[in-house]
UniProtKB/Swiss-Prot annotation:
<feature type="repeat" description="TPR 1">
    <location>
        <begin position="12"/>
        <end position="44"/>
    </location>
</feature>
<dbReference type="InterPro" id="IPR019734">
    <property type="entry name" value="TPR_rpt"/>
</dbReference>
<feature type="repeat" description="TPR 5">
    <location>
        <begin position="148"/>
        <end position="181"/>
    </location>
</feature>
<comment type="similarity">
    <text>Belongs to the magnetosome MamA family.</text>
</comment>
<feature type="repeat" description="TPR 3">
    <location>
        <begin position="80"/>
        <end position="113"/>
    </location>
</feature>
<feature type="repeat" description="TPR 6">
    <location>
        <begin position="182"/>
        <end position="215"/>
    </location>
</feature>
<keyword id="KW-0677">Repeat</keyword>
<keyword id="KW-1281">Magnetosome</keyword>
<dbReference type="Pfam" id="PF14559">
    <property type="entry name" value="TPR_19"/>
</dbReference>
<feature type="region of interest" description="C-terminal domain (CTD)">
    <location>
        <begin position="113"/>
        <end position="217"/>
    </location>
</feature>
<comment type="function">
    <text>Probably forms a large homooligomer on which other magnetosome subunits assemble. Required for formation of functional magnetosomes from pre-existing vesicles, it has a dynamic location in the cell.</text>
</comment>
<feature type="site" description="Salt bridge that stabilizes NTD">
    <location>
        <position position="79"/>
    </location>
</feature>
<comment type="subunit">
    <text>Oligomerizes into high molecular weight complexes (at least 560 kDa). Forms round, 20 nm diameter complexes with a central cavity. Interacts with full-length Mms6. Probably binds MamC.</text>
</comment>
<feature type="repeat" description="TPR 2">
    <location>
        <begin position="46"/>
        <end position="79"/>
    </location>
</feature>
<keyword id="KW-0802">TPR repeat</keyword>
<dbReference type="InterPro" id="IPR011990">
    <property type="entry name" value="TPR-like_helical_dom_sf"/>
</dbReference>
<dbReference type="GO" id="GO:0140923">
    <property type="term" value="P:magnetosome assembly"/>
</dbReference>
Length: 217
């Protein structure tokens, strides 16, 4: 079976990546260096695939990230960064259950890792596991109080659990970070409505509509 062009390119990039370092260490000329690089060992290949896969995930190239990170993920020799970015890539490419499992294991392995907790908490909101999302996002919000997305999604989770006063508090903090976000005003209004506080909901509905109309002009 012939290799895909992208596979061949990655191989050539891998060999080129290490060609110069081989030449410097062994005093080879460039022809000899590239010849040596084509016999690159598995450890170097693993490092390259790991770094390249994580880079793909960070850049939003999730399918490419999955292809590379699956080759270096080892459940027995657990690497939190590999598991985190492979988990993100799985979620983004539709393999939500597999991604969530990896993120949960990542948090179990690194319970104080705020980035892992953030990603897992937001994933729980996405899959509507609000009871699991709330404690994680509260912890993350305390560690990173100016993260708009965390504050907003925490409000969404609280609202869906019927904890409307707490949801409004979280939405208002998010609104302080981004005053002109129409979706936050609308979320506050809906939370007020669900408590029967129509007069308090009305100005937020109006503001949301104004912002939406302004954005469409």
């Amino acid at each position: 079976m012939s290799s895909k062009p992208s596979d061949i390119l990655d191989e050539v990039t891998l060999y080129a990546h290490y060609g110069l370092s081989v030449a410097k260490k062994l005093g080879m000329n460039m022809v000899d260096a590239f010849r040596a690089a084509f016999s690159v060992n598995d450890d170097i290949r693993q490092v390259y695939y790991r770094d390249k896969g994580i880079s793909h995930a960070k850049a939003g190239r999730y399918s490419q990230a999955v292809m590379l990170l699956e080759q270096v993920y080892d459940a027995d020799a657990f690497d939190v960064d590999v598991a985190l970015h492979l988990g993100i890539a799985y979620v983004k490419t539709g393999a939500v259950d597999r991604g969530t499992e990896l993120l949960e294991r990542s948090l179990a392995d690194a319970p104080d890792n705020v980035k892992v907790a953030t990603v897992l908490g937001l994933t729980y909101v996405q899959v509507q596991k609000y009871d699991l999302a709330v404690p994680l996002l509260i912890k993350v919000a305390e560690a990173n109080p100016i993260n708009f997305n965390v504050r907003f999604r925490l409000g969404v989770a609280l609202d869906n659990l019927g904890r409307f006063d707490e949801a409004i508090d979280s939405f208002k903090i998010a609104l302080g970070l981004r005053p002109n976000e129409g979706k936050v005003h609308r979320a506050i209004a809906f939370s007020y409505e669900q408590m029967g506080r129509h007069e308090e909901a009305l100005p937020h509905f109006k503001k949301a509509n104004e912002l939406d109309e302004g954005a469409s002009v």
